[in-house]
Amino acid sequence: MEAIAKISSILKVDQKELEKESIKTYLRLKLRRCESEIFNITKKYKISSVEEFEDLYKKGEIEEEGTWEDFFRLDHLEAEKELIKRALEELQ
């Protein structure tokens, strides 16, 4: 972590604080991107969650062909969002 040491010296901030704030910023950016992608998928299908997406499949209101990629992507993104939130809580 030479970069952290150099930058903390230049900015005259505590190395640990710079590291912590850098991680928070990274996680917030990752969370924003994740939420943006979730928004795009949920808007596309007029749903609010992967559970709602699954209900559309069960009711036959949506075809699996051409949509399953979005379903699995949304499922992954929702799980990732929760992990990021948990990581951010640990840094508070």
Summary of predicted features, one role per range:
Residues 2-5, 86-92:
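Short acidic DE-rich linear segments
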Residues 1-24:
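Short, charge-rich amphipathic alpha-helices with coiled-coil/heptad character
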Residues 42-64:
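Short E/K-rich amphipathic alpha-helical oligomerization segments
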Residues 13, 20, 27, 34, ...:
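Amphipathic alpha-helical coiled-coil segments and their boundaries
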Residues 29, 48, 91:
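Residue-level signal for short amphipathic helical patches enriched in basic/charged
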Residues 20, 24-34, 38-41, 74-84, ...:
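Amphipathic alpha-helical coiled-coil segments
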